[in-house]
Design a protein with these regions (language model features):
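Alpha/beta enzyme core
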Residues: 2-233, 240-242, 246-247, 251, ...
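A short, charged, Gly/Pro-tolerant segment at domain boundaries
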Residues: 261-278
């Protein structure tokens, strides 16, 4: 318990430091160990990455138990704090969200993402009053467990292009402000990519903001200047790895050569990485 409390406290501090918190998302123990070894101060899981790796589509098609089993293996393997992407909480009720928060803590993670997209209706968001109840349930469960779980509350207004584009920003601010008031430590609006809107959001909300970055996004130095607290890469890290495997396969089939294997870590390096687990 004391170790989890200390990790949660240190993870919380990373959201308010001078340096922007960088989270290249992981999907298994090997990817988590690689990110830790590369010097990152925390590890964030990708729900889509884990789902894809186990043969499921994204969108809560994987069970809570399957997702948390992977998260637990990751949390046990690394020394740094782990934050878990648990989609919409694997259930439609505040009680479901609370149970998922407990499972996240029991798995050894000290942070979690909670989104307002509905897996069975990808173009519909959870009604705001219900989403606020879910956030409060997570906060209450964390309090009962005496673990200062860092909650990153997400709206998919931009990612799913919900509603009238002219009203999207204002509705995003309304939702994220309410999430913050309900107990979220950090807020998240994936799909935002242009610097002026990101800067405006930081100024309007005045709280830690997570940006999902990728090709076309402002660079990390630019995001830092805008006041962004946290940058994650989502499932792109896992998908890029799949892209590497695709290039290996295509080269082998087309030319019978192996140049795409040149950057692979050695067998000894991989063994050493696995042996240094806590």
């Amino acid at each position: 318990m004391a170790q989890e409390q200390a990790k949660a406290a240190s993870f919380r501090v990373l959201h308010s430091g001078r340096e922007i918190l960088l989270l290249p998302n992981v999907w298994d123990v090997a990817s988590a160990l690689l990110i830790e070894e590369s010097g990152f101060k925390a590890v964030a899981t990708s729900s889509a990455g884990i789902a894809f790796s186990l043969g499921y589509p994204d969108g809560q098609r994987i069970s809570r138990e399957q997702m948390l089993a992977v998260i637990a293996r990751i949390a046990k393997a690394v020394r740094v704090p782990v934050t878990a992407d648990v989609e919409a909480g694997y259930g439609k009720t505040p009680e479901d969200a609370g149970r998922t928060a407990r499972a996240v803590a029991e798995a050894g993670a000290v942070g979690m993402n909670l989104e307002d997209a509905m897996g069975d209706s990808p173009s519909v968001l959870v009604e705001l009053p219900l989403q606020l109840e879910k956030i409060r349930a997570v906060r209450e469960m964390a309090s009962r467990l005496r673990i200062p779980l860092v909650l990153n509350a997400r709206t998919d207004m931009y990612l799913l292009q919900i509603g009238d584009p002219a009203e999207r920003y204002d509705e995003t601010v309304r939702r994220l402000s309410a999430f913050r008031e309900a107990g979220a430590d950090c807020v998240f609006a994936p799909g935002l990519r242009d610097a002026p809107t990101i800067g405006r959001l930081v100024a309007d909300l005045k709280c830690p903001i997570n940006i999902l970055a990728g090709p076309g996004s402002p660079s990390v130095p630019e995001l830092s200047k805008l006041g962004v607290a946290r940058v994650s890469l989502g499932s792109a890290t896992m998908r890029a790895t799949v892209g590497c495997l695709r290039r290996i396969a295509q080269e082998l089939k087309a030319t019978g050569t192996y140049s795409n294997l040149e950057d692979a870590p050695s067998h000894a390096e991989m063994n050493r990485m696995m042996e240094r687990k806590p």
